[in-house]
């Protein structure tokens, strides 16, 4: 199939209700999405993916297995380069009308430099090893790795703050969801400023898996996971191949995922966020905190 025949019309729509979000149809070509799925299945071992949330397996972009995928797949290297480009960040900031000056960093995704070999050895030592079965040496490696990350986050975050910027990193994963996968109504964790999803394949509305955007009932206090009875469904976005959805993570950026019910349905997607390394997203005004689980990326 030629590149021209794979090309999809590209359009970006932005919305302010129920919270700031955008829908970018044709962000990726159909053929490119197919190749990304094929390469991910070919070059990454299923055992290297983390099973979470009952029906979703994810491969973080900070893992050794993801590094191997990048080394093996030109398509994934191209996507990685595009997502980490100044143009992609500027598109998110400008379209969502964010008033933030970001300073991109690579605390968790650094694959070069003096600390990179040490970090990779720690990750490889821990790969596919449950903590309860880990040796004292592996536990020590995990502790060292997390200390290095915290120190770098604080250092780079402080430097950026002195310059009037916010230190951030693009943290994402390749995910595959199957029958039974569902997400309750929630907002994302405190360190995430902009959340995005890229769908690699389409799923029929009758098979579930739609992204649902919700509005909080007037007068109800915002909390990270509100009671469904306190929310109104504003929009339902059925996954379409090549579509990017992104939104600002505010105190009322409530969304959920409809349960996947199709027995043979698998949804392939990227989930990620522009993640601030120090401090809390200033748009989160609710009284209840929802800490970001940094352990996913170590």
Q: In which residue ranges do the predicted regions lie?
A:
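Fe(II)/2-oxoglutarate oxygenase catalytic core
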Residues: 1-298
